[in-house]
Design a protein with these regions (language model features):
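Extended lipid/amphipathic-ligand handling interfaces
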Residues: 164-165, 194-198
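Extended beta-sheet lipid-handling architectures
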Residues: 174, 192-194, 206-211, 223-225
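Transmembrane alpha-helices
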Residues: 1-158, 169, 217-220, 230-359
Length: 359
């Protein structure tokens, strides 16, 4: 048996195991979510078709979150099977080292990482937007709570700070507009307020505008109508009104560069931007953490220990990544450190364990 045949066999087995675990975990989580929402879907008169649509539109969002865990379990399962059936010994007998065995799985892990990036960056945000639109359109009048106060929206627009009391569902009508203008040093230079605003072919037109210029003397001007020259599209307003959980890479980049308004702090979006790069690479780290299972520890009676070690370290990696990312989004840690430190640290741990076991 030549190495190309072994490589194809390894790749096929690895991909089948990972995809099986991915679909199993996603189906379980989606089933739990569906059990919670099934009564609401049926009360809206959507029937069985509504249940199917609910499941399919939310499934990509669930799958995107469990890819690293599926790679960890799939890698451990694949290597454990090879070790328990002495296939690892057979591979080593034809001259393949454990490093070459793991290297044969690397292209498949890279394909999974690329697919994970596409799903998180393109598929999940579109599914979330479609789900929100469908869920809002089918909402019953009895489900709407008129007594709930409408929360104003705060966001940064360049150096300025904007507050909008309410935004319409289509993002083309706003009420209660206030904008504090600031200079490059962050010092307030004026205040603009308007009763309402509407978006048309020429941009935003404000009504009942009052502009205050801070200085000596204080200047206050009023006008019935005024054009609001800002780069705020109706889609941007919709995102501000209902912030999406899944944000595509291009949108995050525009927010960080100041070309798209966001309701969170700059560190939050910078952390999310770094996570867009780092999250798909977690699959490679998971494969590395599973490597000790393939390193002949079965001969020492430590196969179960290596399996448990890979599982525990992988779960700790996921937990620490989530905690540090939350700290980065809150501004407690620099975004680069919050996102990349667990990835680099656990990749180093996995590599060190692999070298130690082989040595």
């Amino acid at each position: 048996m030549n190495r190309s045949t072994i490589t194809r066999y390894l790749t096929r087995t690895f991909l089948v195991r990972v995809l099986s675990v991915l679909f199993a975990l996603s189906a379980l989580l989606q089933l739990l979510d569906l059990l919670d929402a099934a009564s609401t879907v049926l009360e809206r008169g959507l029937g069985g078709g509504g249940l199917v649509y609910y499941t399919m539109i939310r499934l990509p969002m669930v799958m995107e979150r469990v890819v690293p865990l599926a790679v960890l379990i799939g890698s451990l399962s694949t290597l454990w099977t090879f070790a328990s059936t002495n296939e690892i010994v057979a591979m080593r007998s034809v001259g393949m080292t454990p490093y070459q065995i793991m290297g044969a799985l690397l292209p498949a892990a890279l394909v999974i990482s690329i697919a994970h990036f596409i799903m998180a960056d393109q598929v999940a945000p579109r599914c979330e937007r479609a789900f929100v639109s469908w869920w809002t359109a089918t909402e019953l009048p009895s489900e709407k709570k008129d007594d709930d106060p409408v929360k104003p929206v705060w966001f940064r627009l360049g150096d300025h700070v904007v507050r909008i009391a309410s935004i319409s569902d289509d993002g083309k009508h706003i009420e209660g507009v206030e904008m504090v203008t600031r200079d490059a040093d962050g010092k307030a230079t004026g205040l603009m307020s308007a009763v309402s605003g509407d978006h048309g072919p020429d941009g935003w037109q404000l009504s009942g505008v009052v502009q205050t210029e801070i200085g000596e003397p204080l200047r206050v001007t009023q006008s019935d109508k005024a054009r609001w020259d800002v780069d705020l599209s109706p889609n941007n307003m919709i995102d501000l009104r209902k912030p999406p959980e899944n944000i595509p890479f291009n949108r995050l980049l525009r927010i960080v560069r100041g070309n798209w308004a966001g309701g969170e702090s700059p560190t939050y979006y910078a952390t999310r931007l770094h996570s867009t790069y780092a999250a798909p690479l977690a699959s490679l780290v998971m494969l590395l953490l599973a490597a000790p299972v393939a390193h002949g520890m079965r001969r020492r009676g430590g196969a179960m220990g290596s399996l448990a070690l890979g599982t525990v370290i992988g779960l700790i990696f996921l937990l620490s990544s989530g905690i540090l990312s939350s700290m980065g989004q809150a501004g407690a840690l620099p975004p680069v450190m919050a996102v990349w430190s667990p990835l680099i640290l656990f990749a180093a741990i996995g590599g060190a364990i692999m070298v130690y076991v082989e040595g």
